Amino acid sequence: NINGISETTKEFWRVKEKKSPHNVATSTEKILEIANDKGYRTTSSSESVLNYVTEEVDLENGTVADTVTIPYSQSNVVKWEYNSETKRYTRYSRNKKQTDWTTGEDVTAKNIIIEFIANSTLNDGENKGRQTMNTTGTKDGYYITNGKSIPIKCEKVSRSAKTVYKDLSDKCVENIKK
């Protein structure tokens, strides 16, 4: 129940350099203010959804992945380009380098996980073309880091469960070391 339409303009604002409707911005601080005002919990006793890979990983048997292209749709294709000096991927969308709206820095990632999931158009009577995605069960995917990729299995037993990412020898991705 927090959204940029019903809240006031002090919590959400439009970035004039971007095209509407995808130009509404906010901050973590503003979201927390709204959550506190509405009496929402802002802490959790659940463990983190992701176990981040913090050590350097060498996928020695991996496939070269200097450029990773992800077609979300015909008009929305994301590309990640690997920089061997920084050991990070830079994100491009619609053939333009993406930058942080506040800092102007390139959007980058050390690790990329791609998960192939089934999606379909919702039959909700409104015919808005909204999509539903099946994120539970075992799915195929890729773990990408340091210019290489390996196939993985993505396992999620329920909607509220944490997704577990494993290589094809059943080893959790966060346990793959140099």
Feature roles, as predicted:
Residues 1-178:
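A surface/extracellular/periplasmic glyco- and lipid-processing/surface-interacting theme
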